[in-house]
């Protein structure tokens, strides 16, 4: 009897669909990111699951607002994931 799915070598797509604790190698899904302010182009480091409103240090505009999970970036803000 041959299994249709290889349990020891799962595909990357199937691992990303699983819950973070049920993956073959457990790991967090949160990250830090550099967010660029659309008004003054100042870069601020923000946590992806921030629980408070993040404000730009120089022009005091709102960069992201918290939701139940990940923080929502405001319109016009661009981000880059940090390594």
Curated annotation (Swiss-Prot):
<comment type="subunit">
    <text>Component of the small ribosomal subunit (SSU). Mature yeast ribosomes consist of a small (40S) and a large (60S) subunit. The 40S small subunit contains 1 molecule of ribosomal RNA (18S rRNA) and at least 33 different proteins. The large 60S subunit contains 3 rRNA molecules (25S, 5.8S and 5S rRNA) and at least 46 different proteins.</text>
</comment>
<dbReference type="GO" id="GO:0003735">
    <property type="term" value="F:structural constituent of ribosome"/>
</dbReference>
<dbReference type="Pfam" id="PF01667">
    <property type="entry name" value="Ribosomal_S27e"/>
</dbReference>
<dbReference type="GO" id="GO:0008270">
    <property type="term" value="F:zinc ion binding"/>
</dbReference>
<dbReference type="InterPro" id="IPR000592">
    <property type="entry name" value="Ribosomal_eS27"/>
</dbReference>
<comment type="similarity">
    <text>Belongs to the eukaryotic ribosomal protein eS27 family.</text>
</comment>
<dbReference type="InterPro" id="IPR023407">
    <property type="entry name" value="Ribosomal_eS27_Zn-bd_dom_sf"/>
</dbReference>
<keyword id="KW-0687">Ribonucleoprotein</keyword>
<feature type="zinc finger region" description="C4-type">
    <location>
        <begin position="37"/>
        <end position="59"/>
    </location>
</feature>
<dbReference type="GO" id="GO:0003723">
    <property type="term" value="F:RNA binding"/>
</dbReference>
<keyword id="KW-0689">Ribosomal protein</keyword>
<dbReference type="GO" id="GO:0002181">
    <property type="term" value="P:cytoplasmic translation"/>
</dbReference>
<keyword id="KW-0479">Metal-binding</keyword>
<keyword id="KW-0863">Zinc-finger</keyword>
<dbReference type="GO" id="GO:0000028">
    <property type="term" value="P:ribosomal small subunit assembly"/>
</dbReference>
<comment type="function">
    <text>Component of the ribosome, a large ribonucleoprotein complex responsible for the synthesis of proteins in the cell. The small ribosomal subunit (SSU) binds messenger RNAs (mRNAs) and translates the encoded message by selecting cognate aminoacyl-transfer RNA (tRNA) molecules. The large subunit (LSU) contains the ribosomal catalytic site termed the peptidyl transferase center (PTC), which catalyzes the formation of peptide bonds, thereby polymerizing the amino acids delivered by tRNAs into a polypeptide chain.</text>
</comment>
<protein>
    <recommendedName>
        <fullName>Small ribosomal subunit protein eS27</fullName>
    </recommendedName>
</protein>
<keyword id="KW-0963">Cytoplasm</keyword>
<keyword id="KW-0862">Zinc</keyword>
<dbReference type="GO" id="GO:0022627">
    <property type="term" value="C:cytosolic small ribosomal subunit"/>
</dbReference>
<dbReference type="GO" id="GO:0005829">
    <property type="term" value="C:cytosol"/>
</dbReference>
<dbReference type="InterPro" id="IPR011332">
    <property type="entry name" value="Ribosomal_zn-bd"/>
</dbReference>
């Amino acid at each position: 009897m041959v299994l249709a799915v290889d349990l020891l070598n799962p595909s990357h797509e199937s691992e990303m669909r699983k819950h973070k604790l049920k993956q073959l190698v457990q790991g967090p899904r949160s990250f830090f990111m550099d967010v660029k302010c659309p008004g003054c182009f100042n870069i601020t480091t923000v946590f992806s699951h921030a629980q408070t409103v993040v404000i730009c240090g120089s022009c005091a505009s709102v960069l992201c607002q918290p939701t139940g999970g990940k923080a929502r970036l405001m319109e016009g803000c661009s981000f880059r994931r940090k390594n």
